[in-house]
């Protein structure tokens, strides 16, 4: 199992956690969360964070470790997750990615480069000033000596892209053109088993609505009040998550509680739809319709057989 990587993905509320813990127990695995909200501390209810009890003694990584006042990039996630995969494999265990953030998953299993995530605002402003004073062609000429390929492929009037190319060179010391995927986007060093859980849409939406009701019963309002008291505001990355921004609107008197709950349910259903659209783009993803299996045990057996017999 040295280079195997199991992925259990799917839309919100489909039931990924229970299945993944069961698989981890049976396959000697450890779990790496691929959820862009569960990374944050103090945000347990609205992110539906897995509890210690639900973990069933299986180690879970990249959960509950980022301060919600801080920004956290996909590039940072990729670096931490890649290190953790190596660590798990070095101990003879199976790393299992579990979650619904498609970009996090792709950062690990696709040939992507996140140099473009880095920014140098000061240098950008300087380049904008140069372009305003001397024109786009002058700015474009600055590319010629450092990145001829980008100079030839980017039109001088595409100021935003020209600035991006110059900025990338300043940040990395490498030409912007060198960051293009040289091979297939689906090239990966791992032997992947990629499963996406799904179910009848009406059933999934019912589960989503019920989950939102349970969040309020568990104390979502109190959780967001505490975050607000800590100084968190709606312009922070963490507070833009579904469930948090709407409760902030309610606490600020912008909407009623009824509207708040309905907005979270609608937002979560729309998000589930977008998640499924994202997962369908990857030809390696094997969709598992939960309705066609009589039990979770059967789904677990199917995945284990696939891995053993491959």
UniProtKB/Swiss-Prot annotation:
Leading EC class: transferase
Cofactors demanded by this protein: Mg(2+)
Keywords recorded for this protein, A-Z: ATP-binding, Magnesium, Nucleotide-binding, Transferase, tRNA processing
Interaction with substrate tRNA, annotated site positions: 101, 124
Pfam hit, one: IPPT
UniProt entry tagged with the keyword Transport: no
Binding site for ATP: 10-17
Nucleotide-binding found in the keyword field: yes
Positions of region (Interaction with substrate tRNA): 35-38
Annotated GO MF terms: ATP binding; tRNA dimethylallyltransferase activity
GO biological process: tRNA modification
Catalytic activity: adenosine(37) in tRNA + dimethylallyl diphosphate = N(6)-dimethylallyladenosine(37) in tRNA + diphosphate
EC number: 2.5.1.75
Binding locations of substrate: 12-17
UniProt record similarity statement: Belongs to the IPP transferase family.
Protein purpose: Catalyzes the transfer of a dimethylallyl group onto the adenine at position 37 in tRNAs that read codons beginning with uridine, leading to the formation of N6-(dimethylallyl)adenosine (i(6)A).
Oligomer and partners: Monomer.
NCBIfam families per UniProt: miaA
Name the record gives this protein: tRNA dimethylallyltransferase
Organism for this UniProt entry: Clostridium perfringens (strain SM101 / Type A)
């Amino acid at each position: 199992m040295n280079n195997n990587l199991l992925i259990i993905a799917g839309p919100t509320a489909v039931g990924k956690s229970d299945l993944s813990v069961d698989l981890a127990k049976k396959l000697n695995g450890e779990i790496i969360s691929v959820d862009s909200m569960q990374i944050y501390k103090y945000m347990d209810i609205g992110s539906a964070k897995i509890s210690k009890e639900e973990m069933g003694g299986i180690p879970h990584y990249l959960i509950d470790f980022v301060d919600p006042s801080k920004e956290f990039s996909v590039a940072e996630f990729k670096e931490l997750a890649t290190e953790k995969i190596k660590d798990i494999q070095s101990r003879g265990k199976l790393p299992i990615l579990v979650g619904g953030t498609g970009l996090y998953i792709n950062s690990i299993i696709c040939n992507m480069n996140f140099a473009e995530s880095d920014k140098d605002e000061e240098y950008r402003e300087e380049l904008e000033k140069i372009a305003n004073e001397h024109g786009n062609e002058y700015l474009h000429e600055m590319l010629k000596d450092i990145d001829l390929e980008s100079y030839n492929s980017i039109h001088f009037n595409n100021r935003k892209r020209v600035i991006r190319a110059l900025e990338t060179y300043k940040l990395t010391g490498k030409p912007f053109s060198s960051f293009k995927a040289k091979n297939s986007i689906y090239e990966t060093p791992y032997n992947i088993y990629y499963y996406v859980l799904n179910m009848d849409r009406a059933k999934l939406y019912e589960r989503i609505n019920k989950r939102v009701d349970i969040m309020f019963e568990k104390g979502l309002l109190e959780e967001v009040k505490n975050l607000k008291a800590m100084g968190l505001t709606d312009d922070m990355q963490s507070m833009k998550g579904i469930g948090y921004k709407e409760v902030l609107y309610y606490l600020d008197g912008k909407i009623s509680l009824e509207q708040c709950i309905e907005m979270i349910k609608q937002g979560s259903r729309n998000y589930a739809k977008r998640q499924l659209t994202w997962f369908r783009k990857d030809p390696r993803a094997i969709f598992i319709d939960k309705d066609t299996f009589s039990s979770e045990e059967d789904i677990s057996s199917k995945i284990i057989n696939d891995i053993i017999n491959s």
